[in-house]
């Protein structure tokens, strides 16, 4: 299997760091999974942007009379959850769609369920936890209306992330179960080491692409090789 240069994240040249991952939906992900994989990537981006907006909301919270703890925690959540969510749940589902790996599907279900729980907690907004959720935002209207309005923006975004995360988890789980996936298959991959064998992964990727192409071919209309012009035998 040829080594491809890492291209993600696309860092500016002045940063003395190199990309850590290779990511290309068009070449790695079969057509039947590409849309879902991209939507999960967009969900990760939305979650990261929401954490950034939450930092601004906590700054407004601080300016309006709130404590500095929330702002500090919001900054911590931004620099911690953005890379961790990419590594812990997006990369597993990316590799699962790429190689049809039950082990990576299970890793995604485990970590993404945790992501869903965290998103719900963030949307609720317990004061002192560094998130502008519903409780924190609504309760701050009595202190500073302007700051509370700003805090509502990340609150709505956290709610959207939680809802979209639930929908995504349900959709991927339905697909996985419908395709015959199970915990026993994931355990078998773990026992045999197939989940980290590059040759096995390449074979699985080729099989996934072949299955996708076969499904597309079956959906195409069939035409006869011999033209039929419909001439009548009667003169």
Curated annotation (Swiss-Prot):
Top-level taxon: Eukaryota
Topology class, membrane: Multi-pass membrane protein
A GO cellular-component term linked to this record: synaptic vesicle membrane
Single GO BP term: exocytosis
Transmembrane segments annotated in the record for this chain: 40-60, 68-88, 103-125, 149-169
Subcellular location: Cell membrane; Golgi apparatus membrane; Golgi apparatus, trans-Golgi network membrane; Recycling endosome membrane
Extracellular side: 61-67, 126-148
Cytoplasmic side: 1-39, 89-102, 170-235
Keywords attached to this entry: Cell membrane, Cytoplasmic vesicle, Endosome, Exocytosis, Golgi apparatus, Membrane, Protein transport, Synapse, Transmembrane, Transmembrane helix, Transport
Chief location of this protein within or outside the cell: membrane
Purpose: Required for the calcium-dependent exocytosis of signal sequence-containing cytokines. Probably acts in cooperation with the SNARE machinery.
Assigned protein family: Belongs to the SCAMP family. SCAMP5 subfamily.
Protein name: Secretory carrier-associated membrane protein 5B
Protein's organism: Xenopus laevis (African clawed frog)
Source organism phylogeny: Eukaryota, Metazoa, Chordata, Craniata, Vertebrata
Name of the encoding gene: scamp5-b
